[in-house]
Curated annotation (Swiss-Prot):
The species this protein was found in: Methanocaldococcus jannaschii (strain ATCC 43067 / DSM 2661 / JAL-1 / JCM 10045 / NBRC 100440) (Methanococcus jannaschii)
Superkingdom of the organism of origin: Archaea
Disulfide bonds: none
GO terms classed as biological process: proteolysis
Gene Ontology terms, MF aspect: metallopeptidase activity
Pfam families (UniProt xref): PmbA_TldD_1st, PmbA_TldD_2nd, PmbA_TldD_3rd
PANTHER family given in the database record: METALLOPROTEASE PMBA
Annotated Gene Ontology cellular component terms: cytosol
Name used for this protein in its record: Uncharacterized protein MJ0231
Length: 416
Protein backbone atom coordinates (compact mmCIF):
# COMPACT_ATOMS: atom_id res chain seq x y z
CA UNK A 1 0.00 0.00 0.00
CA UNK A 2 1.57 3.25 -1.18
CA UNK A 3 1.05 5.53 1.82
CA UNK A 4 3.80 7.82 0.57
CA UNK A 5 1.60 8.65 -2.41
CA UNK A 6 -0.95 10.22 -0.04
CA UNK A 7 1.79 12.35 1.51
CA UNK A 8 2.85 13.57 -1.94
CA UNK A 9 -0.73 14.49 -2.86
CA UNK A 10 -1.03 16.62 0.26
CA UNK A 11 2.34 18.28 -0.19
CA UNK A 12 1.56 19.08 -3.82
CA UNK A 13 -1.44 21.10 -2.59
CA UNK A 14 0.72 22.90 -0.04
CA UNK A 15 -0.37 20.90 3.02
CA UNK A 16 1.71 19.21 5.67
CA UNK A 17 0.30 15.70 5.70
CA UNK A 18 0.19 12.74 8.07
CA UNK A 19 -1.08 9.24 7.29
CA UNK A 20 -1.94 6.53 9.83
CA UNK A 21 -2.61 2.99 8.62
CA UNK A 22 -3.98 0.42 11.07
CA UNK A 23 -4.74 -3.26 10.51
CA UNK A 24 -5.80 -6.05 12.87
CA UNK A 25 -6.69 -9.73 12.61
CA UNK A 26 -8.64 -11.50 15.34
CA UNK A 27 -9.87 -15.04 15.95
CA UNK A 28 -12.16 -15.88 18.87
CA UNK A 29 -14.25 -18.75 20.19
CA UNK A 30 -16.99 -18.20 22.75
CA UNK A 31 -19.26 -20.05 25.15
CA UNK A 32 -23.01 -19.58 25.43
CA UNK A 33 -23.58 -21.15 28.81
CA UNK A 34 -21.53 -24.34 28.81
CA UNK A 35 -21.95 -24.88 25.08
CA UNK A 36 -19.48 -23.73 22.48
CA UNK A 37 -21.24 -20.92 20.64
CA UNK A 38 -19.21 -19.98 17.59
CA UNK A 39 -15.86 -19.20 16.05
CA UNK A 40 -15.45 -15.66 14.82
CA UNK A 41 -12.74 -14.32 12.56
CA UNK A 42 -12.36 -10.65 11.77
CA UNK A 43 -10.02 -8.46 9.76
CA UNK A 44 -10.24 -4.70 10.09
CA UNK A 45 -8.11 -1.94 8.64
CA UNK A 46 -8.31 1.72 7.85
CA UNK A 47 -6.47 4.91 7.03
CA UNK A 48 -6.65 8.24 8.81
CA UNK A 49 -5.25 11.42 7.22
CA UNK A 50 -4.54 14.77 8.87
CA UNK A 51 -3.44 17.87 6.98
CA UNK A 52 -2.19 21.26 8.23
CA UNK A 53 -2.02 24.60 6.44
CA UNK A 54 -2.06 28.21 7.65
CA UNK A 55 -3.05 27.34 11.22
CA UNK A 56 -5.88 25.06 10.16
CA UNK A 57 -6.18 21.29 10.52
CA UNK A 58 -8.24 18.87 8.43
CA UNK A 59 -9.03 15.22 9.05
CA UNK A 60 -10.67 12.36 7.16
CA UNK A 61 -10.59 8.58 7.25
CA UNK A 62 -11.56 5.56 5.17
CA UNK A 63 -11.56 1.79 5.55
CA UNK A 64 -9.88 1.28 2.20
CA UNK A 65 -7.03 2.86 0.28
CA UNK A 66 -8.46 5.87 -1.51
CA UNK A 67 -6.52 8.89 -2.76
CA UNK A 68 -9.62 11.04 -2.31
CA UNK A 69 -9.24 10.78 1.44
CA UNK A 70 -6.53 13.45 1.29
CA UNK A 71 -8.80 15.85 -0.58
CA UNK A 72 -11.59 15.16 1.92
CA UNK A 73 -9.25 16.11 4.75
CA UNK A 74 -8.41 19.35 2.93
CA UNK A 75 -12.12 20.24 2.84
CA UNK A 76 -12.62 19.60 6.57
CA UNK A 77 -10.38 22.39 7.85
CA UNK A 78 -10.86 23.95 11.29
CA UNK A 79 -8.87 26.62 13.10
CA UNK A 80 -6.12 25.04 15.19
CA UNK A 81 -2.85 26.91 15.68
CA UNK A 82 -1.41 24.46 18.21
CA UNK A 83 -1.44 21.16 16.32
CA UNK A 84 1.82 20.13 14.67
CA UNK A 85 3.17 16.87 13.34
CA UNK A 86 5.96 14.97 15.07
CA UNK A 87 9.56 15.12 13.85
CA UNK A 88 11.92 12.15 13.39
CA UNK A 89 13.37 10.91 16.68
CA UNK A 90 14.92 7.87 18.30
CA UNK A 91 12.51 5.17 19.38
CA UNK A 92 12.99 2.51 22.01
CA UNK A 93 11.23 -0.73 21.12
CA UNK A 94 9.82 -2.37 24.28
CA UNK A 95 10.44 -6.09 24.65
CA UNK A 96 7.64 -8.61 24.53
CA UNK A 97 5.18 -6.85 22.24
CA UNK A 98 5.09 -9.45 19.44
CA UNK A 99 5.17 -13.24 19.61
CA UNK A 100 5.23 -15.56 16.60
CA UNK A 101 3.47 -18.17 18.75
CA UNK A 102 0.30 -16.10 18.47
CA UNK A 103 0.55 -16.11 14.67
CA UNK A 104 0.83 -19.91 14.71
CA UNK A 105 -2.02 -20.37 17.21
CA UNK A 106 -4.87 -22.15 15.42
CA UNK A 107 -8.58 -22.46 16.15
CA UNK A 108 -8.17 -25.95 17.60
CA UNK A 109 -5.86 -24.66 20.34
CA UNK A 110 -8.23 -21.80 21.15
CA UNK A 111 -11.10 -24.29 21.44
CA UNK A 112 -8.98 -26.61 23.58
CA UNK A 113 -8.20 -23.77 25.99
CA UNK A 114 -11.85 -22.74 26.15
CA UNK A 115 -12.98 -26.28 26.96
CA UNK A 116 -10.26 -26.55 29.61
CA UNK A 117 -11.57 -23.45 31.36
CA UNK A 118 -15.16 -24.63 31.09
CA UNK A 119 -14.46 -28.13 32.41
CA UNK A 120 -12.53 -26.85 35.43
CA UNK A 121 -15.56 -24.81 36.41
CA UNK A 122 -18.00 -27.67 35.80
CA UNK A 123 -15.83 -30.16 37.70
CA UNK A 124 -16.00 -27.82 40.70
CA UNK A 125 -19.81 -27.69 40.71
CA UNK A 126 -20.06 -24.26 39.10
CA UNK A 127 -22.52 -23.18 36.43
CA UNK A 128 -20.80 -21.69 33.39
CA UNK A 129 -22.53 -18.53 32.17
CA UNK A 130 -20.20 -17.45 29.39
CA UNK A 131 -16.57 -17.42 28.34
CA UNK A 132 -14.18 -16.83 25.51
CA UNK A 133 -10.64 -17.19 24.23
CA UNK A 134 -9.16 -15.05 21.47
CA UNK A 135 -6.00 -14.01 19.70
CA UNK A 136 -5.27 -10.76 17.90
CA UNK A 137 -2.46 -9.51 15.70
CA UNK A 138 -2.19 -5.77 15.15
CA UNK A 139 -0.12 -3.60 12.83
CA UNK A 140 0.20 0.17 12.55
CA UNK A 141 2.30 2.50 10.44
CA UNK A 142 2.48 6.29 10.72
CA UNK A 143 4.24 8.60 8.26
CA UNK A 144 4.23 12.38 7.85
CA UNK A 145 5.70 15.25 5.86
CA UNK A 146 8.41 15.82 8.46
CA UNK A 147 10.03 12.47 7.67
CA UNK A 148 8.54 10.37 10.45
CA UNK A 149 8.04 6.78 9.32
CA UNK A 150 7.41 4.35 12.16
CA UNK A 151 5.64 1.02 12.28
CA UNK A 152 4.75 -1.47 14.99
CA UNK A 153 3.32 -4.95 15.23
CA UNK A 154 1.92 -6.56 18.35
CA UNK A 155 0.06 -9.67 19.45
CA UNK A 156 -2.55 -10.36 22.12
CA UNK A 157 -3.99 -13.47 23.75
CA UNK A 158 -7.11 -13.17 25.92
CA UNK A 159 -9.23 -15.50 28.02
CA UNK A 160 -12.33 -14.86 30.14
CA UNK A 161 -15.00 -16.84 31.97
CA UNK A 162 -18.14 -15.99 33.92
CA UNK A 163 -19.57 -18.54 36.36
CA UNK A 164 -22.11 -19.02 39.13
CA UNK A 165 -21.27 -20.95 42.28
CA UNK A 166 -23.77 -21.49 45.07
CA UNK A 167 -25.84 -18.56 43.84
CA UNK A 168 -22.92 -16.13 43.51
CA UNK A 169 -21.61 -15.00 40.12
CA UNK A 170 -18.02 -14.12 39.33
CA UNK A 171 -16.00 -13.12 36.30
CA UNK A 172 -12.30 -13.39 35.57
CA UNK A 173 -10.26 -12.39 32.53
CA UNK A 174 -6.72 -11.81 31.39
CA UNK A 175 -4.97 -10.36 28.34
CA UNK A 176 -1.27 -10.70 27.59
CA UNK A 177 0.97 -10.33 24.55
CA UNK A 178 1.83 -14.06 24.59
CA UNK A 179 0.08 -17.33 25.36
CA UNK A 180 -0.52 -18.13 29.04
CA UNK A 181 -2.01 -20.99 31.05
CA UNK A 182 -5.78 -20.45 31.00
CA UNK A 183 -6.45 -22.83 33.90
CA UNK A 184 -5.69 -20.08 36.41
CA UNK A 185 -8.53 -17.98 34.99
CA UNK A 186 -11.12 -20.59 35.95
CA UNK A 187 -9.57 -21.24 39.35
CA UNK A 188 -9.55 -17.52 40.15
CA UNK A 189 -13.18 -17.19 39.12
CA UNK A 190 -14.04 -20.13 41.38
CA UNK A 191 -12.11 -18.62 44.27
CA UNK A 192 -13.91 -15.29 43.87
CA UNK A 193 -17.33 -16.94 43.82
CA UNK A 194 -16.61 -19.24 46.77
CA UNK A 195 -15.30 -16.43 48.97
CA UNK A 196 -18.38 -14.31 48.32
CA UNK A 197 -21.13 -16.97 48.21
CA UNK A 198 -23.90 -16.91 50.83
CA UNK A 199 -22.96 -13.38 51.78
CA UNK A 200 -24.29 -11.43 54.74
CA UNK A 201 -25.46 -7.84 54.82
CA UNK A 202 -22.57 -6.13 56.58
CA UNK A 203 -22.01 -2.43 57.19
CA UNK A 204 -18.42 -1.58 57.97
CA UNK A 205 -16.18 1.42 58.50
CA UNK A 206 -12.41 1.01 58.42
CA UNK A 207 -9.85 -0.54 56.07
CA UNK A 208 -11.22 -1.01 52.55
CA UNK A 209 -8.97 -2.97 50.19
CA UNK A 210 -9.54 -2.57 46.46
CA UNK A 211 -8.12 -5.28 44.19
CA UNK A 212 -6.26 -4.19 41.04
CA UNK A 213 -9.35 -5.08 39.01
CA UNK A 214 -11.69 -2.99 41.16
CA UNK A 215 -9.13 -0.18 41.17
CA UNK A 216 -8.89 -0.10 37.39
CA UNK A 217 -12.66 0.09 37.00
CA UNK A 218 -12.83 2.98 39.46
CA UNK A 219 -9.68 4.92 38.56
CA UNK A 220 -10.47 4.89 34.84
CA UNK A 221 -13.36 7.24 35.58
CA UNK A 222 -11.85 9.27 38.44
CA UNK A 223 -8.09 9.49 38.96
CA UNK A 224 -6.66 8.80 35.51
CA UNK A 225 -8.51 11.58 33.63
CA UNK A 226 -7.26 14.16 36.15
CA UNK A 227 -3.67 13.89 34.84
CA UNK A 228 -4.65 14.72 31.25
CA UNK A 229 -3.36 18.16 30.24
CA UNK A 230 -6.42 18.41 28.02
CA UNK A 231 -8.69 18.16 31.08
CA UNK A 232 -6.44 20.49 33.07
CA UNK A 233 -6.60 23.14 30.34
CA UNK A 234 -10.39 22.81 30.11
CA UNK A 235 -10.80 23.24 33.89
CA UNK A 236 -11.99 19.65 34.18
CA UNK A 237 -9.35 18.48 36.66
CA UNK A 238 -8.99 19.19 40.37
CA UNK A 239 -5.22 18.90 39.86
CA UNK A 240 -5.01 22.14 37.88
CA UNK A 241 -2.39 24.49 39.31
CA UNK A 242 -1.15 21.98 41.89
CA UNK A 243 2.23 21.00 40.40
CA UNK A 244 4.68 20.75 43.31
CA UNK A 245 1.96 20.38 45.92
CA UNK A 246 1.44 17.43 48.28
CA UNK A 247 -1.81 15.99 46.94
CA UNK A 248 -1.59 12.42 48.28
CA UNK A 249 0.05 10.55 51.14
CA UNK A 250 3.79 9.90 51.04
CA UNK A 251 3.11 6.23 50.25
CA UNK A 252 1.85 7.17 46.79
CA UNK A 253 4.08 7.28 43.71
CA UNK A 254 2.41 7.13 40.30
CA UNK A 255 4.23 6.74 36.98
CA UNK A 256 3.05 6.61 33.38
CA UNK A 257 5.44 4.44 31.37
CA UNK A 258 4.88 3.61 27.71
CA UNK A 259 8.35 2.05 27.38
CA UNK A 260 7.88 -0.76 29.91
CA UNK A 261 8.86 -4.19 28.59
CA UNK A 262 6.05 -6.78 28.28
CA UNK A 263 3.34 -4.34 29.44
CA UNK A 264 0.02 -4.19 27.59
CA UNK A 265 0.09 -0.51 26.63
CA UNK A 266 3.75 -0.08 25.74
CA UNK A 267 4.86 0.97 22.27
CA UNK A 268 7.65 2.72 20.37
CA UNK A 269 5.58 5.84 19.91
CA UNK A 270 2.18 7.33 20.56
CA UNK A 271 -0.58 8.04 18.05
CA UNK A 272 1.27 11.08 16.68
CA UNK A 273 4.69 9.49 16.27
CA UNK A 274 6.19 10.96 19.45
CA UNK A 275 8.45 8.50 21.26
CA UNK A 276 6.87 7.10 24.41
CA UNK A 277 8.57 7.80 27.71
CA UNK A 278 8.47 7.32 31.47
CA UNK A 279 6.70 10.23 33.18
CA UNK A 280 6.56 10.58 36.96
CA UNK A 281 3.12 11.97 37.79
CA UNK A 282 3.19 11.75 41.59
CA UNK A 283 6.30 11.18 43.71
CA UNK A 284 5.86 10.44 47.40
CA UNK A 285 2.50 12.19 47.24
CA UNK A 286 3.74 15.31 45.40
CA UNK A 287 2.23 16.17 42.00
CA UNK A 288 5.06 16.37 39.45
CA UNK A 289 3.61 16.32 35.93
CA UNK A 290 0.59 16.09 33.66
CA UNK A 291 0.31 14.02 30.48
CA UNK A 292 0.54 15.76 27.08
CA UNK A 293 0.12 15.23 23.38
CA UNK A 294 1.62 17.74 20.92
CA UNK A 295 -1.38 20.07 20.78
CA UNK A 296 -1.81 20.32 24.55
CA UNK A 297 1.96 20.67 25.06
CA UNK A 298 2.16 23.54 22.56
CA UNK A 299 -0.54 25.41 24.45
CA UNK A 300 1.83 25.61 27.43
CA UNK A 301 5.15 25.79 25.61
CA UNK A 302 6.03 22.27 26.75
CA UNK A 303 7.03 19.02 25.06
CA UNK A 304 4.69 16.10 24.45
CA UNK A 305 5.06 13.23 26.93
CA UNK A 306 4.11 10.73 24.21
CA UNK A 307 0.54 10.27 25.43
CA UNK A 308 -1.46 10.86 22.26
CA UNK A 309 -3.94 8.06 21.70
CA UNK A 310 -6.01 7.50 18.56
CA UNK A 311 -7.40 5.10 16.05
CA UNK A 312 -7.57 5.76 12.33
CA UNK A 313 -11.11 7.11 12.80
CA UNK A 314 -10.26 9.69 15.46
CA UNK A 315 -8.11 12.71 16.15
CA UNK A 316 -5.45 12.36 18.86
CA UNK A 317 -6.44 12.79 22.49
CA UNK A 318 -4.47 12.55 25.74
CA UNK A 319 -4.53 9.16 27.44
CA UNK A 320 -2.30 7.18 29.84
CA UNK A 321 -0.18 4.29 28.62
CA UNK A 322 0.75 1.98 31.51
CA UNK A 323 -0.49 3.81 34.62
CA UNK A 324 1.64 2.48 37.47
CA UNK A 325 0.95 2.77 41.19
CA UNK A 326 4.16 1.73 42.91
CA UNK A 327 3.96 -1.10 45.41
CA UNK A 328 5.25 -1.02 48.99
CA UNK A 329 6.50 -3.77 51.32
CA UNK A 330 3.08 -3.99 52.98
CA UNK A 331 0.85 -7.04 52.54
CA UNK A 332 -2.64 -8.08 53.58
CA UNK A 333 -1.06 -10.06 56.41
CA UNK A 334 -0.24 -6.74 58.07
CA UNK A 335 -3.94 -6.01 58.63
CA UNK A 336 -6.16 -7.74 61.21
CA UNK A 337 -9.44 -6.40 59.84
CA UNK A 338 -10.63 -5.18 56.45
CA UNK A 339 -13.16 -5.53 53.66
CA UNK A 340 -11.66 -6.81 50.42
CA UNK A 341 -13.45 -5.68 47.24
CA UNK A 342 -12.77 -7.68 44.09
CA UNK A 343 -15.13 -5.85 41.78
CA UNK A 344 -17.32 -2.76 41.52
CA UNK A 345 -20.38 -1.88 39.47
CA UNK A 346 -21.28 1.65 38.40
CA UNK A 347 -17.88 3.32 38.07
CA UNK A 348 -19.13 5.08 34.93
CA UNK A 349 -21.44 7.20 37.10
CA UNK A 350 -18.46 8.75 38.91
CA UNK A 351 -17.69 12.44 38.58
CA UNK A 352 -14.40 12.66 36.62
CA UNK A 353 -13.90 16.30 37.62
CA UNK A 354 -14.40 16.12 41.39
CA UNK A 355 -13.49 12.45 41.90
CA UNK A 356 -16.73 11.70 43.75
CA UNK A 357 -18.09 8.18 43.27
CA UNK A 358 -20.63 5.68 44.60
CA UNK A 359 -20.37 2.07 43.42
CA UNK A 360 -21.88 -1.30 44.23
CA UNK A 361 -19.34 -3.82 45.49
CA UNK A 362 -19.09 -7.32 44.04
CA UNK A 363 -17.32 -10.56 45.06
CA UNK A 364 -16.26 -9.02 48.35
CA UNK A 365 -15.65 -10.31 51.85
CA UNK A 366 -15.04 -9.13 55.40
CA UNK A 367 -11.89 -10.37 57.13
CA UNK A 368 -11.14 -10.25 60.84
CA UNK A 369 -8.49 -12.20 62.76
CA UNK A 370 -8.28 -15.02 60.24
CA UNK A 371 -12.02 -15.37 59.62
CA UNK A 372 -13.64 -14.58 56.26
CA UNK A 373 -17.31 -13.59 56.01
CA UNK A 374 -18.78 -13.14 52.50
CA UNK A 375 -20.61 -9.86 51.93
CA UNK A 376 -23.82 -9.32 50.03
CA UNK A 377 -23.60 -6.49 47.59
CA UNK A 378 -23.30 -3.18 49.41
CA UNK A 379 -22.47 0.40 48.48
CA UNK A 380 -19.06 2.03 48.66
CA UNK A 381 -18.59 5.73 48.01
CA UNK A 382 -16.28 8.64 48.62
CA UNK A 383 -13.84 10.98 46.92
CA UNK A 384 -10.87 9.33 45.26
CA UNK A 385 -8.54 12.30 45.79
CA UNK A 386 -9.28 12.44 49.52
CA UNK A 387 -8.92 8.67 49.85
CA UNK A 388 -5.44 8.66 48.31
CA UNK A 389 -4.24 10.94 51.11
CA UNK A 390 -4.32 7.95 53.47
CA UNK A 391 -3.90 5.12 50.97
CA UNK A 392 -1.46 2.23 51.48
CA UNK A 393 -0.45 0.26 48.37
CA UNK A 394 0.36 -3.40 49.03
CA UNK A 395 2.77 -5.74 47.20
CA UNK A 396 0.53 -7.92 44.97
CA UNK A 397 1.15 -6.17 41.64
CA UNK A 398 -0.67 -7.11 38.44
CA UNK A 399 -1.79 -5.38 35.24
CA UNK A 400 -5.49 -4.75 34.68
CA UNK A 401 -6.13 -2.79 31.52
CA UNK A 402 -3.93 0.30 31.61
CA UNK A 403 -3.38 0.01 35.36
CA UNK A 404 -0.33 -1.72 36.84
CA UNK A 405 -0.91 -1.75 40.58
CA UNK A 406 -1.10 -3.78 43.76
CA UNK A 407 -4.22 -3.90 45.88
CA UNK A 408 -4.56 -0.61 47.78
CA UNK A 409 -5.88 -0.09 51.31
CA UNK A 410 -8.11 2.95 51.86
CA UNK A 411 -10.10 4.30 54.76
CA UNK A 412 -13.78 4.05 53.90
CA UNK A 413 -17.23 2.72 54.63
CA UNK A 414 -19.48 -0.03 53.28
CA UNK A 415 -23.20 0.63 53.59
CA UNK A 416 -25.76 -2.18 53.44
Amino acid sequence: MDLEKLIKIGEKEGFETEVLFVKSYEVSVDLDGKSVDSFQTGISYGIGVRVIKDGKVGFAYANKFDENIVYKAMKNLVEDKYTEFAHPQKYKEPKGMFYKEILDLDEEKLLEDLITMRDIALDNNAIVLSGGVSKEVGYARLINSNGVDVEEQDTYFSAAISIMYDGETSYECRTRHNIFDVEEISYRALDLAKKSANGKAISYKGNIVLSPRALYDLLSYTLMPAFSAENVQRDRSVLKGKIGEQIFGENITIIDDGTLDYALYSSKCDGEGTATQKTVLVENGVLKNYLYDIKRANREGKTSTGNASRGYRSLPYVSPTNFIIKETKNSLDDFDEYVYINGVIGSHTSNPITGDFAVEIQNSYYYKNGKIIPIKRGMFGGNIFEMFKEAIPLNDVEQRGKLISPSVVFKGEIIN
